[in-house]
From Swiss-Prot:
Location in the cell: Cytoplasm
Domain S1 motif: 61-135
Name this polypeptide is given: Exosome complex component Rrp4
Organism: Nitrosopumilus maritimus (strain SCM1)
Entry superkingdom: Archaea
Pfam family, one: KH_1
């Protein structure tokens, strides 16, 4: 069974002893050193580091969009676009009267369902707990899932929400943005949906461009194009 995972940066000693260095690690004397930012794993006699490039690192109170992977009798496991998985306790959904014997989790959330949730607890040494107990959280019943780089999320939101507000007002779309880089777009109009998706993709691909807001606005203002 694998040892507990831990967050490492280049130069960190992952472990010492008779282990075989594998992905993103090197052997220096009897020390196995990480060569990248990532999560270390020790399995049997080998050591590796899973790189975090492009992946989301959870932070407490972050809003995330998760996809249900599976469930036990006590919780759901969510894919949150991270090297970590999110765990949603059944009691968070069923309430205080939840009974593992009487309540069936699949009646609330099934594999493949999307949920908007918040990171409730996380310390890098274990997978995070997520919660849907706040207002506007829970199962997402409609919309198209998009993925952008988590590092581009602040650009998509914009200063005081200016970018996403502009996109929503121009397309009549409703956009839910997860800090993990997953975005759900809902719109009754097919044209509005396509235009909103195009705007979001522009932000993802051109976040470094100085006049990006003007370019997105120009695209949104064009009639009959998507």
């Amino acid at each position: 069974m694998a040892d507990k995972r831990k967050y490492v940066i280049p130069g960190d000693v992952v472990t010492t002893g008779p282990f075989r260095p594998e992905q993103n690690t090197v052997l220096e004397g009897n020390k196995i050193i990480s060569t990248t930012i990532g999560i270390s794993e020790i399995y049997d006699d080998s050591v590796r580091v899973i790189p975090l490039t492009g992946k989301y690192i959870p932070k407490i109170n972050d809003l995330v969009i998760g996809k249900v992977n599976s469930h036990t009798s006590l919780s759901w496991e969510l894919d949150i676009n991270s090297c970590y998985v999110g765990f949603l306790p059944a009691q968070d959904v069923f309430g205080r009267d939840f009974s593992a014997h009487a309540d069936e989790l699949a009646t609330k959330l099934r594999t493949g369902d999307l949920v908007a949730a918040r990171i409730a607890n996380f310390d890098r040494t274990r997978d995070p707990l997520v919660s849907i107990s706040d207002r506007d959280l829970g199962k997402i019943d409609s919309g198209v899932l998009m993925e952008i780089s988590p590092s581009k999320v602040p650009r998509l939101i914009g200063k005081k929400g200016s970018m996403i507000q502009m996109i929503e007002e121009a397309t009549d779309a409703a956009v839910t943005i997860g800090q993990n880089g997953w975005v759900v777009v809902s719109c009754e109009s097919p044209e509005g949906l396509l235009k909103a998706k195009k705007a979001i993709q522009m932000v993802n691909e051109q976040a470094h461009v100085a006049n990006l807001t003007d370019q997105v606005k120009e695209m949104l203002d064009k009639k009959g194009e998507s």
